[in-house]
Design a protein with these regions (language model features):
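Acidic, polar-rich low-complexity tracts and alpha-helical solenoid repeat scaffolds
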Residues: 4-6, 15, 19-254
Length: 254
């Protein structure tokens, strides 16, 4: 009798555990997806990530799985885990090219790199990646409603890269490395001609030429870009450097 009771108790416990397990396994992908959307709305991003990962793993190839892949990227993006978001968005864009979320995912990849772009004095890898992705976005989605926003971001990122080059040129000037300064200012002129840094590049080039004792070249360059330098109130400073170096050269030859 005692053994019977023990066996009966074990069977009852087994049935309870089995039922509990079946209930958990019985949660549908749609239920888990809905849970993820709810958690995303409530800004419970870690829980949302867990929900969407579950749906992605078990719903591969389904519309629900494709949607979950996008929202998994969203859960990372909204949690400011931008590089992880990029990885998830790229899974969507590579594997699910016909998803209605592809355009937004492509734009969010651009935005993620833009946000990760640091101050100009740091390495600009993410700035360059952002520019590349924004340009690809414009090429692939020429009629997108997001294009104006993309163009504004491109302009801002190009200004940053132009500023970095300008400050590099100024550093060379301080080190009396005038040939290197000239090369840097010329690169700025060639690559970032459409930014506000162009006027400072003109001024820097005049001063680099003058400090390098290339007075004729400095005068010629100043004359060529006089209008822009006068307008930006940088002409007088550039001319002052030429006049100063003229005296130095004259003194050296006497």
């Amino acid at each position: 009798m005692k053994n019977f009771i023990q066996i009966f108790t074990i069977l009852v416990l087994f049935i309870i555990v089995s039922c509990a397990g079946s209930k958990g396994e019985g949660v549908s992908l749609q239920d888990r997806f809905n849970s993820g959307m709810g958690n995303l709305e409530k800004e419970k991003f870690l829980q949302a990530q867990s929900d969407f990962k579950y749906v992605v793993m078990r719903g591969t190839g389904s519309d629900l799985g494709d949607d979950a892949q996008y929202y998994l990227g969203e859960a990372f993006f909204r949690n400011k885990e931008y590089l992880l978001a990029v990885a998830e968005y790229e899974k969507l864009t590579r594997r699910m090219a016909f998803s209605p979320f592809v355009e937004d995912a492509r734009f969010k990849i651009c935005e993620a790199y833009r946000i990760e772009s640091p101050k100009y004095y740091h390495d600009q890898e993410y700035t360059e990646k952002a520019l590349e992705r924004f340009q690809e976005f414009l090429d692939d989605f020429p009629n997108s409603n997001l294009n104006d926003e993309a163009l504004v971001s491109i302009e801002s990122l190009r200004e940053k890269l132009g500023l970095k080059l300008y400050e590099t040129g100024i550093l060379y000037m301080k080190l009396d490395e005038f040939e290197s300064a000239k090369m840097t200012f010329q690169t700025l002129i060639d690559m970032y001609y459409d930014t506000d840094m162009i006027q400072f590049a003109y001024q820097g080039m005049v001063k680099a030429l003058a400090r390098n004792k290339q007075i004729d070249e400095a005068n010629a360059f100043l004359g060529k870009h006089k209008g822009r330098l006068v307008k930006s109130e940088l002409y007088a400073d550039a001319q002052k450097t030429i006049d100063k170096m003229k005296k130095v050269v004259s003194k050296d030859t006497n």
